Amino acid sequence: MEARAQARYIRVTPMKARRVVDLIRGMDATEAQAVLRFAPQAASVPVGKVLDSAIANAAHNYDHTDADSLFISEAYVDEGPTLKRFRPRAQGRAYRIRKRTSHITVVVSSKEGTR
């Protein structure tokens, strides 16, 4: 049994979001929630929301209400589209600002069947 959740077009750079996702990959779901709650990175907030959504999807789709028996089987961050902006500089120049976005995916599975 596995349940997945995805957040798309999140305004966090993929490199910074991957640092957070690498922390929780393979952890128990409740332990990962605690780690994300106290992680100092800004990307831990959207990753935590995706994890909560994956746990809720498992409860809804499979009547699997016990979050203690779930673990994170897959977690990855893909790069979304980049918003391009310009910052005016001296003597008529302009520097490009790239505002990167991320697609965050978390898959939770039950422990008894997979591990």
From Swiss-Prot:
InterPro entries: Ribosomal_uL22, Ribosomal_uL22_bac/chlpt-type, Ribosomal_uL22_bac/org-type, Ribosomal_uL22_CS, Ribosomal_uL22_sf. Keywords: Ribonucleoprotein, Ribosomal protein, RNA-binding, rRNA-binding. One of its GO terms (biological process) is translation. It comes from the Bacteria. One of its GO terms (cellular component) is cytosolic large ribosomal subunit. PANTHER family: CHLOROPLAST 50S RIBOSOMAL PROTEIN L22-RELATED, LARGE RIBOSOMAL SUBUNIT PROTEIN UL22M. This protein binds specifically to 23S rRNA; its binding is stimulated by other ribosomal proteins, e.g. L4, L17, and L20. It is important during the early stages of 50S assembly. It makes multiple contacts with different domains of the 23S rRNA in the assembled 50S subunit and ribosome. The globular domain of the protein is located near the polypeptide exit tunnel on the outside of the subunit, while an extended beta-hairpin is found that lines the wall of the exit tunnel in the center of the 70S ribosome. This is Large ribosomal subunit protein uL22. It comes from Streptomyces avermitilis (strain ATCC 31267 / DSM 46492 / JCM 5070 / NBRC 14893 / NCIMB 12804 / NRRL 8165 / MA-4680). The lineage of its organism: Bacteria, Bacillati, Actinomycetota, Actinomycetes, Kitasatosporales. The gene is rplV.
